[in-house]
């Protein structure tokens, strides 16, 4: 018998879309999708039935109301229903379309044909239950930051003969693998991608194959920085970390251990109001913020060693 999932539907003002998506992910949803409805937005989230009871869903509704009130918007409408696994796995896909990000990327759903003669770097993606479709502001900010950091590296998928120093990157909280694949397409020599969610690691493996990335160049593994320490041969050149702010703060000491004086890092998953705490933790361990990019209520920190 198929597993049963909650399908949570939230109709909200468009300005609340990112906040609602973040709230659903924080609630434990394994996938989200959004659809424009005139001036409003319908956001859907999917959660295994055993992870939430009716009281939990009612509490989610209260949190969403509080989020809206805090920024002076009307309360969203929350509904839910039970669906079978095969239904949830495909229902959100109808709302996801090819999306250009930054100056160089196109995120193309795996179930759609790849565009021909396109002048952007195409990332084919089937996120499954993992976070990272390119729709969220934090993912976009990280990809745009990677463009900036790797702008000196040629477009060539193979960087060995490009006359550049090889760039080794760690992707902490890799989700669907979208940032790892983006880094490879921009010319990174190798990416070590870790996530504590085994389903996310599985998704990264699948998307690595979809994009025909050499397995030696993208190495996914289940775990966190402790696993990275075992995988890497030397400190990495770059770090990308798109996870919750509280987790970033906890990991900063360990992340610093896999860096060197020239290492740069990209941190997102951070609400603007949380940025001060994250910056303080980074500065305490020898990092300095070069730029902070904002999109709606989210921010992305581009940092380097002091």
Swiss-Prot record:
Gene3D superfamilies: Vaccinia Virus protein VP39 (3.40.50.150). GO terms for biological process: methylation. It is an enzyme of class 2 (transferase). It catalyses: L-lysyl-[protein] + 3 S-adenosyl-L-methionine = N(6),N(6),N(6)-trimethyl-L-lysyl-[protein] + 3 S-adenosyl-L-homocysteine + 3 H(+). Keywords: Cytoplasm, Methyltransferase, S-adenosyl-L-methionine, Transferase. S-adenosyl-L-methionine binds at residues 139, 173, 195, 242. One of its GO terms (cellular component) is cytoplasm. Its main location: cytoplasm. GO terms for molecular function: protein-lysine N-methyltransferase activity. The keyword Aminoacyl-tRNA synthetase does not apply. HAMAP family: Methyltr_PrmA. Methylates ribosomal protein L11. This is Ribosomal protein L11 methyltransferase. It comes from Trichormus variabilis (strain ATCC 29413 / PCC 7937) (Anabaena variabilis). The gene is prmA.
